[in-house]
Structure formats: C-alpha cells, structure tokens
C-alpha cells in the first residue's frame, strides 16, 4: 500500500500506465507522401520542362491537378485516423486503489507500481499484479489468451515460467472480472505489462503494400515508359519533317501530358475515398486507404473465434431432464421438472443484470437470460425464495449450494460438475416421483454428458435435497442428493456468421479459425458455421510448435481450425499462407490478435470489443464487430477495384486514340490534328468527369461469384491491354475520319476543330462502353449510373459551348461549324457505341 507521495514518485519513475503509440506523422508529412507515386513524379518533371520552355499554361494546369490530388489524399488519410480515434478509449478508464489507508478512485493511467488495487465483478484490470486477497475471483482473460471461459484465481503459488493462462495467482491488464472480488499489488504498468509485451511484438511484424499499391506502381512505370517511347518517336518524326527542335519538343511534351492520365491518381484516390465513406456507413472504418481494394483481393481470412465468429456470450443450448434432452427453444414451463430446473438454476446463481449490464460468471448469466426469455424474472424468483444460507463455489469440490424455503419446505439446491455430483446422488427425479438412482440412470447421464461435451458444450448438473429445518449449510450437507437435470451451454456463433462464411467460400476465400480456446469447443463452432467438415482439419498449436517454416507451408492447406495457439503461432500461420502466394486477412478483437493483424496483408479489428492494440495494428476496424461486415467489405473491395479498372480503361483507350491520331497525321504528312489547349481541355473536363463517374458505378453482386485475383497480377493484363488497343483504335479512326472530312478543302483549322469535337464526344460516349466487360446496351445496367449520365450531359454542353460560342472559339483555336458538320461530329462519336458493344459481344461469345 502506497501513500499519495509514494504514488507520485513511482509514477515519475515507472511512467504512466498506458501503451506507447508509434510516432504519429504530421499532416505535412502525410501531404508529402502523396508525391511519391511514379506517375506524379513524371508529371512534375513534364510540368517543369513545359514551364521552362514557355508553356506556362500547361505547367500550371499540371501542378494544380497534382496539388488537388495530394490535398484530397491527405484529407482522406487524416479523416480515417480521426474516425478511428473516435472509437478509442482506455481499457480501464478508472481504478480503485488504496492510498494513505483510504479507498479512492483514480484514472487508470495514474495507477503505478506498488499500488493496492481493489477489483470486483464488472471491473477491468488496470495493470498487471499479484493477488493479495481473493473471494471467489474469476477473470475473463479471453482478450489476452483467447480462452473464452473465465479463469478462477487463487493465492496459491504457481511454478516459475508457467504459461500465461496458468498463472492463477496473478491478474493482467485488460482482463475483466466476471465474479467475486479481490485486491492485488501492481507489479507492472504500461509497456511492461503482458499487454505491453504483445504490443512490442508489433515492431517485428512488417507492414505490407496492398495489391492495389503494387499494381498501380507497376502500372505507372510501364505506362510512363511506353508513353515516353511514343513521345520520342513523335519528336524524331517532327524533326525529320523539318520542325524546329524547340517546337518538336514542346509538342512531344504536350502529347506526354495528354497521354499520361494525370487525373488517374486523383481519380483513384476519389474512388477509394468514396469507397471508404460508403464502407463507414456499413460499419467498416478504413485506416489505410488502399486497404479498401486490398480486402477484396484476399484469398485467406484467418479469424479469431471468441467475439468475432461467436457472440462472446454464453447461452443455454439444452436441458436434460426426465431422461430426455430438450433444446432451449422447446423448453415447456408447464412441465414441473423443467420449470423446477429453471427456477433452481436462477436461485443457485450469483449473477445479476444491472441496467442491461450483465454482472457475473458467463455460465450463470446465461441461466438468468434464459429465464428472461421464458418470461421468468430472476429477481422476482429470488425475492420469493430468498437465499437462507450457502456454500460458495470453489474449484476443489466443483460445487455450489444454496438454501431456500420453497412451498413449505427447506430445500438445498446444488449445481456443479457432472462427475462430482453423480458421486453424491442417491435419488433421481422421475416425472412427479422420486426414486433411488440406478446404475442404468448413472450410465444414461454420463452418456448424455459425454455427448454434450463432444459437441463443445459446457455442462452443469443440478440436484436438490429437502432439509428438515433451516440451518446454515455445510460441506457435509452436499450428499444424499436427488438428481434433477443437466444444462448445456456454449458461446454460440453469431447469427450472421454461417451465411458470411458460405459467402466467403463461394467467393473463393478460405476462412480459417485461429483461437486460444480448446480444440473440441473450436471445432464444434467451426462445424456449425461451415468452416470445418471433419476433425482431421483441426489441430492444436503444439502440433506446429516444432515445425520448420517449410513444413508449416506444406501443412497449412489441410487445416481449417487451430486451437490453443499463441500470438507467435498466429504470425507463423499467416506468414505460411503468404509464402504460398496468398493474400491474407486476419480478423480479431483481442490483444493476442494484434501481431498477426500487423503481419497480415489486411488486418481487420473489432471496434466495440477490440483492444486498443488490435485497432492500432489493423487496416480496417469493424464498428459493429460483425463478421458479416467483412463479406460486404470483400464485395465493396472487388467492385471498387473493378470500377478503378474501368476508369483506367476509359482514360487509356481515349489517350491511345489521341496518340494514334497524332502519329497518323505525322506519318501522313498532315497538319497536327490538335492544339495543346485541346489536349488540356480533354484531360481536365471530358476525361475526368466520366472517369470519376465510372469509379462510382453501382456495385455489381456478380463479383462475388469470381475467384480472388492471383497475387501479383498486374492491372495491365493481356485482355485489358487488348481492349484498350481495340477501343482506342475505333475512337482514333472516327477522330481521323472527322479530320479528313474537315481537311477536304485544305482548311487545317476546320479539320482540327472537327477532330477535336469528335475525340471529345467519342470519349464521353465511350464512358458507357467502359461500364462493363460485356455488352449492356440493351440492359437496365446501361442506365443505372446517374453520375455518368450527368457527366455525359455536362460534357456535351461544354463541347458545344466551345464549338459554338465565339468568345471561346478564339481561346480554344477552333472555328464555327455548320449544322451538318456538327451532326457529322456527333454522328461519328455515337457510332463508337454500337461498334464497341458489338466487339464486346463477339469477345464474350468466344469465351
């Protein structure tokens, strides 16, 4: 016990009782990171060269686009962190300590080494320590060990080096008192606690780039090299044709600006940003922007059991009474034996429900919750039949007894382990009568108990004994008992878990359960929700302890359930799947999940029950702690990736058309079809709006019928490049057709005007072609994107304004078109739609 002064000194010496956070990046650092993209670097170089050579307009436009993109990325990153911070709260906001001989409440962060802390049912343990006094203390350490059932604590010494879950004379930060009360002396705080040690493991787990980051980096380098080659060819052709070196270089740079989709980075960021906002509304907060797509790419989900796949709440499954097993949903309170078993289970019970908060051992709260579901108020039952005396539960005899006055007689109610109670039975309740218990009765009870246990159920036996008079119960009274029945219970799966697992399997994702709980219990849950088919797919962590990394890589495909695992096991399992070429997601809520969350490609933490360490390690936080939210996130991720691909296809096919048109004009010794201002107009207006709209395409549930993309698969696949080439060729042909029509009389300005109008209009129309890889012109899906329709209408108005308004004609170096010429421009642009839709139909038929 400390004095206040000693507590202050120790607080200075050992530091505050909190976990250290990694060094936070400043907003300016986050802003600078937005400029690391290879495409952005190329554009900056182009802008500098353009400005140096006099094309200040192009340089300004490029810098504005890049800066806007960087600001948007910074805002989204900061917003995501702020959303997560709103979830954060201290593991134990306050703690009761004894200082200067007085009990006082202090912030958990001020608890220090040497403090005497008082805890009781409902309290969180604020720091690690050794027990001083104990009164039937049980502690839920599931967040630390993965064990779903509370651990009974005592003052008995334990062997040095005992496993964490076996240190029954100590309590650990972040644990939860479910029953009893105790006092303990604090021995470790902050990063020195067991929670802190696990947090330290995170430093050894490297962070991974998401698939989108890898693909876009690869894509940007290949695209830039290709475009620079094209620009070099154009520069050489221009010089050979007699153009001055300066003019040839300026146009090559202008073409580079037009060909490199500088809007790409900002469009990808905008699409991901909208994706994160949509997912936040669906209870998923994204901490790392590109994780939106990354989650949709996973092929393995390693999930914790307790609180993630299950409810983290014990519920009654079955009654065994009068020789029959009855499901909890079929309990009939008109049956005297069933009603008596329910009543006795609420009387021989210390748990309570205070303002909706369950206080007590989970197995006991499950019993009073069942009573509530059946219309029986435990408080009224206890008031009607008050407890006269008791023999509290202890782990040695594994029994609890209470005495009550019921219907004119004194009754002792006993509950406990089946094997212990059977030894003390002399009679059995058989319908309305009592009779002596037979060996056959005992065998039936043992068989039923074994059946329940093999299905992962926790079993309690109940018995009673009529007393001659009120007396203080003693241990000697717990004999000559009458067997009443068994009650089985378990931490059941979440309602949504089975469907969520089935959806994952349909999508080609293998769900794996990794837990610190017992193998039988874990396997029972896994079978219920579809993760496990037979017991050969389940193993305990000890099995992989001595395996080499290579042996583990060969072993993991055969296992769907891992039980009794340590944090180090989890990291090894995740890494083994990654070494096999899989993209791995790890879901969980406990401190023990955090290292694997960090090691995984995508870490998914629980927002309500999740520990602070787990949230900090994760890429995504589920605010509803619902496993089914992950399935929606997978669908969102896949759709967002597809939408980004559609936007890229739209941008590159249009850019390819412009390149083909310019190259054709150069090779055919024709005038240059576009002025630099034309290309800037196309990039900023007729490209960006439809591309963003394509990124916001309504989600297509069909993506969940596809298998995950192969790890390392580039965006620039052969079919993707072929589509870009063919579609770009079609648009290029229409553009140069318009150019040649306008150039019949040798009017280069008219030819350039018609080519510019056709290219702009064609790209607007082409947005509808890029909605899907198959023809959709005659389906509802063709019209389901209001953003794309809006971009098309706005783009048409802008083009028409440039072509028809005299003040804009001079600025954009175009001339007035006749009605016939205008119809020719729009007609050629619209022709792209049926032509490309027909090509998609032919390609689909071939598949």
Each model region followed by its residue ranges:
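Conserved cytosolic headpiece of P-type ATPases
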Residues: 1-705, 715-716, 729, 740, ...
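Generic alpha-helical transmembrane segments
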Residues: 686, 731, 753-767
């Amino acid at each position: 016990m400390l004095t206040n002064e000693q507590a202050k000194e120790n607080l200075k010496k050992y530091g505050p009782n909190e976990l250290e956070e990694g060094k936070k990046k400043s907003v300016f650092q986050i802003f600078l990171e937005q400029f690391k993209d290879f495409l952005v670097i190329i554009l900056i170089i182009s802008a500098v060269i353009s400005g140096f050579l006099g094309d200040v307009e192009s340089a300004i436009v490029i810098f504005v686009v890049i800066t806007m993109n960087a600001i948007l990325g910074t805002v989204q990153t900061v917003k995501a962190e702020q959303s997560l911070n709103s979830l954060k709260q201290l593991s134990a906001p306050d703690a009761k300590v004894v200082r200067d001989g007085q009990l006082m409440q202090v912030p958990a962060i001020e608890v220090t080494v040497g403090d005497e802390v008082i805890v009781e049912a409902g309290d969180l343990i604020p720091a690690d320590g050794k027990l001083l006094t104990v009164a039937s203390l049980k502690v839920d350490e599931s967040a630390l060990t993965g064990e779903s059932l509370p651990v009974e604590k005592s003052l008995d010494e334990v062997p040095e080096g005992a496993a964490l879950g076996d240190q029954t004379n100590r309590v650990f930060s972040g644990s939860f008192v479910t029953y009893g009360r105790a006092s303990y002396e604090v021995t470790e705080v902050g990063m020195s606690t067991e929670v802190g040690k696990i947090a330290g493991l995170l430093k050894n787990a490297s962070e991974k780039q998401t698939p989108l980051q890898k693909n876009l980096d690869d894509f940007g380098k290949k695209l830039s090299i290709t475009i620079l080659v094209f620009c070099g060819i154009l520069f050489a052709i221009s010089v050979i044709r007699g153009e001055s070196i300066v003019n040839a270089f300026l146009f090559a740079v202008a073409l580079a600006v037009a060909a490199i989709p500088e809007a790409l980075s900002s469009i990808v960021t905008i699409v991901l940003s909208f994706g994160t906002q949509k997912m936040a509304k669906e209870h998923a907060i994204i901490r790392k922007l590109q994780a939106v797509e990354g989650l949709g790419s996973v092929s393995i989900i390693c999930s914790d059991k307790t609180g993630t796949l299950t409810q983290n709440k014990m519920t009654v499954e079955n009654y065994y009474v009068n020789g029959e097993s009855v499901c909890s949903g079929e309990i009939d309170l008109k049956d005297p034996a069933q009603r008596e078993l329910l009543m006795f289970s609420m009387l021989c019970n210390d748990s309570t429900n205070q303002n909706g908060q369950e206080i007590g051992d989970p197995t006991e709260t499950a019993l009073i919750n069942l009573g509530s579901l059946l219309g029986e108020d435990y408080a009224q039952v206890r008031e009607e039949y008050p407890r006269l005396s008791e023999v509290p539960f202890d782990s040695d005899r594994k029994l609890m007894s209470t005495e009550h006055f019921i219907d004119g007689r004194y009754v002792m109610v006993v509950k406990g382990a089946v094997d212990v109670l059977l030894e003390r039975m002399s009679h059995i309740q058989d319908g309305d009568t009592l009779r002596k218990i037979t060996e056959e009765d005992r065998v039936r009870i043992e068989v039923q108990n074994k059946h329940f246990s093999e299905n992962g159920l926790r079993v309690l036996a109940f018995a009673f004994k009529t007393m001659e008079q009120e007396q203080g119960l003693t241990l000697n009274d717990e004999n000559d008992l009458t067997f009443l029945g068994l009650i089985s219970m378990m931490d059941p799966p979440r309602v949504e878990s089975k469907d969520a697992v089935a959806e994952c399997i349909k999508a080609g994702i293998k769900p794996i359960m990794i837990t610190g709980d017992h193998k039988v219990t874990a396997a029972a849950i896994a079978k219920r929700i579809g993760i496990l088919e037979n017991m050969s797919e389940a193993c305990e962590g000890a099995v992989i302890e001595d395996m080499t990394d290579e042996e583990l890589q060969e072993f993991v495909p055969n296992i769907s359930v891992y039980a009794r695992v340590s944090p180090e096991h989890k990291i090894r399992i995740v890494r083994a799947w990654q070494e096999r070429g899989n993209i791995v997601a790890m879901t969980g809520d406990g401190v023990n999940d955090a290292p694997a969350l960090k090691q995984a490609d995508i870490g998914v933490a629980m927002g309500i029950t999740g520990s602070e360490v787990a949230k900090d390690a994760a890429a995504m936080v589920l605010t509803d702690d619902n496993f089914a939210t992950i399935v929606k996130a997978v669908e969102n991720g896949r759709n967002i990736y597809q939408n980004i691909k559609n936007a890229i296809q739209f941008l590159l096919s249009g850019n390819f058309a412009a390149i083909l048109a310019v190259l054709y004009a150069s090779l055919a010794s024709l005038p240059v079809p576009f002025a630099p201002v034309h290309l800037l107009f196309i990039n900023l207006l007729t490209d960006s709006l439809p591309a963003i709209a394509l990124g916001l395409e309504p989600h297509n549930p069909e993506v969940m019928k596809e298998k995950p993309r192969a790890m390392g698969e580039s965006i620039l696949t052969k079919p993707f490049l072929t589509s870009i080439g063919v579609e770009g060729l079609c648009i290029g042909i229409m553009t140069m057709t318009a150019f040649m029509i306008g150039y019949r009389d040798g009017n280069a300005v008219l030819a350039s005007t018609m080519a510019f109008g056709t290219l702009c209009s064609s790209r607007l129309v082409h947005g509808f072609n890029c909605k899907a890889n198959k023809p959709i012109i005659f389906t509802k899906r063709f019209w389901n994107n209001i953003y794309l329709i809006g971009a098309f209408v706005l783009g048409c108005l802008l083009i028409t304004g440039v072509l028809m308004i005299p003040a804009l004609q001079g600025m954009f170096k175009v001339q007035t078109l006749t009605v016939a010429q205008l119809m020719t421009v729009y007609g050629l642009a619209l022709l792209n739609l049926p032509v490309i839709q027909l090509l998609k139909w032919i390609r689909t038929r071939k598949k």
